[in-house]
Amino acid sequence: MDLSAVGLTVRFGALAALNRVDLEVAAGERRAVIGPNGAGKTTLLNVIAGEHRPTEGSVRLGGRDATPLPPWRRARLGLGRTFQRSTLFSQLTVADNIALAVRARNRSGWRFWPGSEDGLNQEVSRRLEAGGIGHLARRPAGRLGHGERRILEVELALAASPSALLLDEPMAGLSGDERQKTLGRLRSLPKEVTVDIVEHDVDAVFALAEGITVLDHGVKIADGTPTEVRANARVQEVYLGGL
């Protein structure tokens, strides 16, 4: 599913968190949004997901105007996301968190699973193994380490079988091994799944993204391939430095 934003402006009083930002992510593209702290990256994801209403501008998902739609309607269109802050059910086990996400996708709550309970259990097991967290299945989410929680959050977003996935700093706080595991998981996603990732881990961005959008103080300052962005003098000045 393609997604686009045109002329997005978000004002909080006199502050413009976004100022006429355009974004185009083609269906199946892996795109990253980078920039310094306070650049407006998370605000951009929040507007695309429907968490914030733009002061000006519009959002389209799969060619449809999604600007007036609440988050749950956008999710029904196939949009999934993760957040900077944890959204796990800490008292439930890792497996139960994933099971709940799968049931939500099927709009079945806890009471009904289309087909059989075996079907649910099999899908949960597949997703645990795909995320490399099968050994944590019975552990309460509240007892996970920070990196383990981040990995589970990615798996919860994927359990919704999204057509487009918004990821907000999925590498934050991960160990080297966890980082490689998450990067491999994202690389293995079906090509038809669109990925838009906000991330400070520049090495991960350049390893994953086909296109990169750079924000600074709410303004888009660059947009292009990783090679083009790395060579951009303005991006070097405000963000990449000597990388």
Task: Please provide the spans of the model-predicted regions.
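Glycine-rich phosphate-binding loops of nucleotide-dependent enzymes
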Residues: 2-243
